[in-house]
Amino acid sequence: QPIWWADDINAWVVSRYDDVRAIMKDAKKFSSKAMGERDHEISLPLLTDDPPKHTQLRAIVNKAFTSKTLKSMELEVKDMVSTMLDRLDPNQPVDISADFTIPLPIAVISKLMGIPFAKKDDFKRWSDALTGTSSANSLEERMPQIMEMATFFQSLIPERRQNPGEDLISKIVAAEVDGRALEDMEIVGFNMLLLIAGNETTTN
C-alpha cells in the first residue's frame, strides 16, 4: 500500500514520490505544526514550521551549507578522517560504526556549530534520546536526557550574544525573523535539530 497507518509511530506513512511531493508543497492541508504537538514541550524549528517562517529559518543556515563553504572545509574534514583512521589498531578488530562512522559526522557538525567535540558521547546520547533510538523507549524515560541537551544549548546563548563568531550558533542567536530576534527556546530547539540533522542522518 502506498499510504498506510503505522501504529508504532502513530502516523500515516506515505511512500510514493508524487504523493510525498504534493503533501510537502501543501502546507495548508498538511501543516508541520502538528509535529510540535506530539512529543515534548521543546519545539524543533523547521520540523514544526510552515512557510513563510520555515523558509526564513532555512535561510539563516543555508549559507553554511553552500558548496563553496563546504569545499573550504574539505581539507579539515580529510584531516579528521585521517586522525580517526590513525587511531585504529590495524592488529585488532574494529567496530567501524563506534570508532568511525558515528564520531566523524559529530566532529564535522561540532566544528560548524562551534561546540566541543570532546562532548561527542553526550551529543550521541542526546541525539538518540531525542529521536527515540536510545535504549530508553518511552518519552518519560528519555526526557531527562532531552532536557540535559536543551540546558547545554541554552547555556551557550549569553556567550554567543556577547562574543559572536562565525559558527552556526552565533548566526542563529543573531538572526531575526519578521523583524524580531528568536526567543531563547527557539534558539535551543534550532540547535538541537541541527545537531541531530548533522550526525544522526549520516551515521544511519
Language-model segment annotations:
Residues 161, 165, 177-180:
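Hydrophobic/basic alpha-helical segments enriched in Actinobacteria
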Residues 126-129, 171-175, 190:
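Short acidic/histidine-centered micro-motifs embedded in hydrophobic/aromatic stretches
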Residues 120-125, 162-172:
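Short, charged hinge/linker segments at domain and secondary-structure junctions
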Residues 102, 106, 149, 176-204:
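Central I-helix of cytochrome P450 enzymes
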Residues 142-150, 154-161, 188:
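Metal-assisted phosphate- and nucleotidyl-transfer catalytic regions
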Residues 1-97, 106-124, 128-146, 155:
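Active-site substrate-recognition loop segments, prototypically the cytochrome P450 B′-helix/B-C loop
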Residues 93-94, 168, 177:
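Acidic interhelical loop/turn segments
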